[in-house]
Amino acid sequence: MPGLQTSNLAAAVVVATKLNLTLDQDCIDEAFMALSIAGRQQQLVAMDRLWWLDVAHNCESVARLAVAIAEKSDGVETHAIFGTMADKPLRAMIELISEGISSWHLPAHEGIARAANPADLAQLIKRISPKVAVQCYPTPESAFNGIENVSKPGDRIVVFG
């Protein structure tokens, strides 16, 4: 079950075992195989591109996402649409995942006071990865439209933050 977090289900199984509840091993196996969490490395195909949607918004979840990207790189270009809150550990988050990203697309989030400014994120990304392409957009919708112009069929687009 690559790309999915199983720790919560595993914890539930441990608790049930400690409480001496009877669990059917086939049901446990089936639950692990069927486990999926919307927004956690969720994969969709649209516009002939593979889209990964992940709510990764802290260092731990960004690190897991970076590992998943590295494990499934297969020479595929990976473009990121990234937005986050300004009070997050921005440098650390970007450093964790930057090696796997070919281009960054940073939308503004109008009306969200805590949202990180895309221009500030762009400066930080350029300091960490000077050669990578970075584009700022006024809205998330414009970032989605813009990424279609720089990506090609078969590319991966990771939307996270």
Which stretches of residues belong to each language-model region?
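Nucleotide phosphate-binding/pyrophosphate-handling subdomain across enzymes
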Residues: 1-103
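C-terminal helical cap/extension that packs against the catalytic core
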Residues: 6, 50-51, 59, 94-156
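Glycine-rich phosphate-binding loop signature in dinucleotide/nucleotide-binding domains
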Residues: 22, 72-76, 147-157
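Glycine-rich beta-strand-to-loop/alpha-helix junction loops that act as flexible
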Residues: 82-84, 109, 160-161
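Short, amphipathic C-terminal "tail helix"
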Residues: 89, 154-161
